[in-house]
Amino acid sequence: MECDAVIYNITENVQQVEEALWAVSALNEEISHFEKRKVFILLSTVMTWARSKPLDPDDNEVPFTEEDYRRRKHHPNFLDHINAEKIVLKFGKNAKKFATYVVASGLQYGAEGGILHTFFKMAWLGEVPALPVFGDGTNCIPAIHVVDLAGVIQNIIDHVPKLHYLVAVDEAVHTLEDLVKCISKNTGPGKIQKVPKENAFLTKDLTQEYLDHLLVNLRMEALFVKENFNIRWVAQTGFVENINSILKEYKQSRGLLPIKICILGPPAVGKSSISEELAKYYKLHHIKMKDVIAEAIAKLEAIVAPKDSVEGEEEGEEEEEEENVDDAQELLDGIKESMEQNAGRLEDQYIIRFVKEKLKSMPCRNQGFILDGFPKTYDQAKDLFNQEEEEEEEEIRGKIFPYDKLITPEFVCGLDASDEFLKERVMNLPESVVAGTHYSQDRFLRSLSHYRDINTDDETVFNYFDELEIHPIHIDVGKLEDAQNRLAIKQLIKEIGKPRNYGLTDEEKAEEEKKAAEERLAKEAAQTAELEHKEAMEMAEKIARWEEWNKRLEEVKREERELLEVQSVPLRNYLMTYVMPTLMQGLNECCKVRPEDPVDFLAEYLFKNNPEMQ
């Protein structure tokens, strides 16, 4: 209630309608307590005009303006929106105390992309050969940049105009086909494909509300805004005319800036393996010279291959195609001649041309790239990255010369290792890997020697990047003692930073979760097996100790028995010599006499017949 201006946006979330109506009602009830005028602005949508009848039945191109708002007919799915508009306008009758406004906004673009984000994302990812246009694509869509829309709202607050219903659209008249084609051309595959409207429901990011906005056919003109407001327009001429700045906003807002990396170093140092891992981590395009050349030649051959003429082709298109065929054939002939004269190797001028074309391709411009092992020399780097329109051939060293920022790497990594380390690494490679590659002994040593030779002068490829103040990250792979290059990759990721893309797709997330679950189950199974093994080992050890204890106990008992036997020998001898003869005689005599008290008789007998007393 303390705010002088209250703005409710019901274009993005229909749930805001109820809250907006509550707010305007509550403010209206407090009019008598207002010390100064308050302004309430309802940001609505041109979809409340979607079913309006043409102003001129004979001319459908006559646009609607603010003055026609009483004739507007809403789209069936936007009943809540038009009801909200009517209620807000009804509460603004006491404009000196409480002024209410409704702004019918066109399809909003800019910043993160808005409703058009689905097409931006498809184009940026490059996963489809053509962007879809739902229906025939001829429907006109009123639109406005979000910053310009903010300017309209700011002017309403500043000027409090007498007109309470305003239209906010730019001056362009664009169809759905115009918008999609523009996105495809400037950040996508460059092609569009018209598909049935029903196919839109197969695109998960498109809601019914978004689809309604994309399929509306309406011509509108913000006449009052144009004549009465002072707005610093960002995109007054519309989406297509301002696509470059809109794309820049979109990429910056969503953090979709390309990562451009160059990995250099001697043969067998691990350039390709590290590049491959970084390409997977950052979702970049791995640029290998062999693949680039093969792809470029294949494209040229496809152009010059005979094609069946397509009916309906315009004369201008046919002439342009013929010129392309002639140019492609001329280039192919030059490549063939170059390879014949250079023992199967291609001259730098062709390699640089193909690499430059690849780096300027839309996928590389969107996501970025990793240049694997190229350029090798200062001159190659200069020819590849310098601006083509150089003023002078000779550049002053130490001065930053013009270079193509679109394709010049942002990060340069120089891998290195001692010759002994590299030779040993190649020697340890399996024969199946070495066969037919540049890792064979003669070719490898020649390549290594050539690399050392071209990197001893002051004009090395690393000097080129230093002059551009793109200072290479130098890593001595030999000192890391890591055959898998994990430490080098970890160091590079730390230097480069986080990925700049949309992150994992739903499929990749599911795969990651599945992989994590499998790893967790495997870990749990390993822990269970380890625990069971440990318990079994402890039990076996316990049984072994028990058996050992019993064995020792039996041994002790045996030793005790033997000791007792040894100790009892003198006693037995004594008994047999001195006691038993007399005792036996006494027992025999007792048996003969059979006295009443045998014990007393025996004692008396032994006493009388004791040999020591006789």
From Swiss-Prot:
Biased composition (Acidic residues): 311-327
Gene Ontology biological process terms from the UniProt entry: axoneme assembly; brain development; epithelial cilium movement involved in extracellular fluid movement; establishment of localization in cell; inflammatory response to antigenic stimulus; spermatogenesis
E.C. no: 2.7.4.3, 2.7.4.6
Annotated segments matching region Disordered: 308-327
Knocked-out gene: effects: Mutant mice present pathological signs characteristic of primary ciliary dyskinesia (PCD), including high prevalence of microtubular defects, significantly decreased ciliary beat frequency, hydrocephalus, abnormal spermatogenesis, mucus accumulation in the paranasal passages, and exacerbated respiratory responses upon allergen challenge. This phenotype arose serendipitously in the process of generating transgenic mice harboring a heme oxygenase 1 construct, due to the serendipitous disruption of Ak7 locus by the transgene insertion event.
Residues at which ATP binds: 268-273, 478
Localization in the cell: Cytoplasm, Cytosol; Cell projection, Cilium, Flagellum
Region described as NMP: 288-346
Gene Ontology CC terms, in alphabetical order: cytosol; extracellular region; motile cilium
CDD domains registered for this protein in UniProt: ADK (cd01428), DD_AK7 (cd22967)
InterPro entries: Adenylat/UMP-CMP_kin (IPR000850), DD_AK7 (IPR047499), Dpy-30_motif (IPR007858), NAD(P)-bd_dom_sf (IPR036291), P-loop_NTPase (IPR027417)
Binding annotation for AMP: 323-346, 373-376, 380, 446
Principal location class: cytoplasm
Keyword list, A-Z: ATP-binding, Cell projection, Cilium, Cilium biogenesis/degradation, Coiled coil, Cytoplasm, Flagellum, Kinase, Nucleotide-binding, Transferase
Keyword check for Nucleotide-binding: yes
Coiled-coil positions: 376-568
Record carries keyword Thylakoid: no
GO molecular function, one term: adenylate kinase activity
Family the entry assigns: In the central section; belongs to the adenylate kinase family.
Function: Nucleoside monophosphate (NMP) kinase that catalyzes the reversible transfer of the terminal phosphate group between nucleoside triphosphates and monophosphates. Has highest activity toward AMP, and weaker activity toward dAMP, CMP and dCMP. Also displays broad nucleoside diphosphate kinase activity. Involved in maintaining ciliary structure and function.
Protein name per UniProt: Adenylate kinase 7
